[in-house]
């Protein structure tokens, strides 16, 4: 993979992730909530993930792992562990239906919006990048 292509893939991941944080992600059953943007889900999920037993927030870690894989060679064990954790947390994120709040009430997610689906695409693309970069580095030099 050429350096230019790696940069383009890296920028696509960064821009896609930034857009997923800017776009509306979910709506809850609370009367006072409109569409919650992705950045709010990132902050709320990061701070209060332990109040609702969910690990889906940790799928966000696949993005910096993919960017690192585009830049530096990763050991196979690290890539395998990253892919496994991303798969588990992504499944959990897709099953996710509650949001913790600051007033100790758990709100139910009633609808997902484009920010959530773009986030899922970026996380899956990041996992694919990690897997492919490991595979490419394991091939003989003439087969890339």
Predicted regions and their residues:
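Compact integral membrane and secretory-pathway proteins
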Residues: 1-144
